[in-house]
Amino acid sequence: MSRDPLPFFPPLYLGGPEITTENCEREPIHIPGSIQPHGALLTADGHSGEVLQMSLNAATFLGQEPTVLRGQTLAALLPEQWPALQAALPPGCPDALQYRATLDWPAAGHLSLTVHRVGELLILEFEPTEAWDSTGPHALRNAMFALESAPNLRALAEVATQTVRELTGFDRVMLYKFAPDATGEVIAEARREGLHAFLGHRFPASDIPAQARALYTRHLLRLTADTRAAAVPLDPVLNPQTNAPTPLGGAVLRATSPMHMQYLRNMGVGSSLSVSVVVGGQLWGLIACHHQTPYVLPPDLRTTLEYLGRLLSLQVQVKEAADVAAFRQSLREHHARVALAAAHSLSPHDTLSDPALDLLGLMRAGGLILRFEGRWQTLGEVPPAPAVDALLAWLETQPGALVQTDALGQLWPAGADLAPSAAGLLAISVGEGWSECLVWLRPELRLEVAWGGATPDQAKDDLGPRHSFDTYLEEKRGYAEPWHPGEIEEAQDLRDTLTGALGERLSVIRDLNRALTQSNAEWRQYGFVISHHMQEPVRLISQFAELLTRQPRAQDGSPDSPQTERITGFLLRETSRLRSLTQDLHTYTALLSAPPPVRRPTPLGRVVDDVLQDLEPRIADTGASIEVAPELPVIAADAGLLRDLLLHLIGNALTFGGPEPRIAVRTERQGAGWSIAVSDQGAGIAPEYQERIFLLFQRLGSLDEALGNGLGLPLCRKIAELHGGTLTVESAPGEGSTFRCWLPDAGPLPGAADA
């Protein structure tokens, strides 16, 4: 089980420490054990309705002392509301779900009742209420139209702050936007005349600690009615059923952190209210409202503000998406040019560095590093070469396929000195890891930030809330212009485009290189042995021809001795051998550079019949018997090449099958193709030679003892590979051999309909 790296301290009422700026992120603000005094709070068992806890001021609002309330049931206390309350808040419902009612209470007049459930606990809040101005709903309707009509985010922020101030009457209303580092900036402000302006000011993250931001994300409205009012404890302070603090994160009456109360008083604020702006599940910002005097906003108006906050959240999401879409639209044609060039490129370096593509302008960058196939080159203003090497080495340590920052020195401290040309970085990987990548760089911008009284570092110096909120100007170094969200999305899409396009082209190049390497090796082997194997028959023919010229002849010129007859027979055999070798060499060299064959439906039985007819004299001479399966399939193949393959395989079986060879030709369906097996019962082949026989001119035994020319089986394997298939042998000494050629099916084949 994972453990929170910053666990909460126990609350002060359980012996926890005093909260300071150094430990405020660990303050348990959701379990204060007390409430604000402008209302009363009860907790009750979610099943029985038994009252478990009450605020010590309950008698002021409910007319009953805690000792009287404790142990009562909600059915007795709220007989009219209890059934509806149970139905509205069933067990397991979200804690954001509420039950609302207005009570006519003898002790306090009209009370607003708000109830929510936290696990097995019901939390009931009672506040005095009065009729809301009837113009309120109309004002909300008008506000909705105004928000929807705002043309951009800046206008939307201004409309929101002005509308909230008109609805509520707060002295100051700000829209406060969080940055990625959790600092916040006031991007819009509506204020009473005479108040100091905070528009454009930035505030450190410590002003709203992490646990407060998390609470604002879950519960959208927070009210501090009086920054000088004392909190009212719960009685008992712990839930008597669990002996644990009661979670009040969703209660509007929850007591405010003493640290935050002092912070507000130091600002001269008498009351405050905030409404969360949550976009995509993340806390985007706050509508922050300040009043110089205590101010209890009526519950109905608070609900209206919560609706307004939700609408603003949706409009922010819409406006930001529209801004990104408009930005992306301006890049679409540029992206298309890059994609088209990459798709037709065999040299990524040369193509992507072409000034006509303007990859620098695509991302509004000052410099670009292109890294492909172990080398890099640059465009525009970039750091010196050693720094580029170091930057690329650092990138290789980064996870993911996209890295972006507007402050490289913060992400990579060693890169701080590169700020003049590389304060900002946007990098995409277009290969495996970062071996192939594009890295855009932006130069440093000298920025002047207006802080609302203290920089983040200064805010850490005091143990208590700061007192000064005067404007403090800070020059920020090491920052570049932030990358627009549209640029980041564009980089991601460009990565996908280039990864696909370059991946295909690089794969083609690598395949071609491998094929070329293999082909060169085969040609070198061919050149090395061809002279010997071609010269041997020629040498023998020459020698025997010379002997023949020395033999006596009859008057009619015919041989007149057995020796002459033997020489003549030898010449004929060697001439035949030379002819066979020449034909096989011609076929093999043609296949080395041949395109994939055109595969048509080919009846295998017809091809086997043709081969056996060609081999009929040899079959008769050897006394061989050949068994052919009765039904052979139609195979997707080049008929001529398939015939050559079977001619060699069956011919091999005749040569090496022993006396009176017994040969079998069979087929079987294997996966998405057919296996053709040619078997003999000859001497067999030892395992260590079973791959060697498929190499060029490799024959078992010495040259004088071995049969064949050493080209037949390599030729057969090449034919199989050109069809996308394989050729293997199964054999053992003394047990014969089976050569298996597997040929895959093809897609729709030419002439398939007529087969």
Swiss-Prot record:
Binding positions for a tetrapyrrole per the UniProt entry: C24
Residue ranges of the TM segments: none
Start and end residues of each GAF domain: 152-316
Pfam families in UniProt: GAF, HATPase_c, PAS_2, PHY
Region annotation Chromophore binding domain: where it falls in the sequence: 95-504
Coiled coil start-end: none
Enzyme Commission number(s) from the entry: 2.7.13.3
Residues found modified as Phosphohistidine: H532
Domain Histidine kinase: 529-747
Recorded catalytic activity of this chain's protein: ATP + protein L-histidine = ADP + protein N-phospho-L-histidine
Keywords annotated in UniProt: ATP-binding, Chromophore, Kinase, Nucleotide-binding, Phosphoprotein, Photoreceptor protein, Receptor, Sensory transduction, Transferase
Domain PAS: 26-94
GO biological process, one term: osmosensory signaling via phosphorelay pathway
InterPro entries assigned to the protein according to its UniProt record, in alphabetical order: GAF (IPR003018), GAF-like_dom_sf (IPR029016), HATPase_C_sf (IPR036890), His_kinase_dom (IPR005467), HisK_dim/P_sf (IPR036097), Light-responsive_reg (IPR052545), PAS-like_dom_sf (IPR035965), PAS_2 (IPR013654)
A GO term, aspect molecular function: protein kinase activator activity
UniProt PTM: Contains one covalently linked tetrapyrrole chromophore. Lacks the cysteine conserved in plant phytochromes (at the position of Met-259) that binds chromophore. An engineered sequence used for X-ray crystallography forms a thioether link to biliverdin through Cys-24. The natural sequence can bind phycocyanobilin and phytochromobilin in vitro, but the identity of the natural chromophore is unknown.
Top-level division of the source organism's lineage: Bacteria
Similarity comment text for this entry: In the N-terminal section; belongs to the phytochrome family.
Protein's job: Photoreceptor which exists in two forms that are reversibly interconvertible by light: the R form that absorbs maximally in the red region of the spectrum and the FR form that absorbs maximally in the far-red region. Also has a slight blue shift for the far-red maximum. Could also absorb green light. May participate in regulating pigment synthesis like the carotenoid deinoxanthin which could protect the bacterium from intense visible light.
Name of the featured protein: Bacteriophytochrome
Gene for this chain: bphP
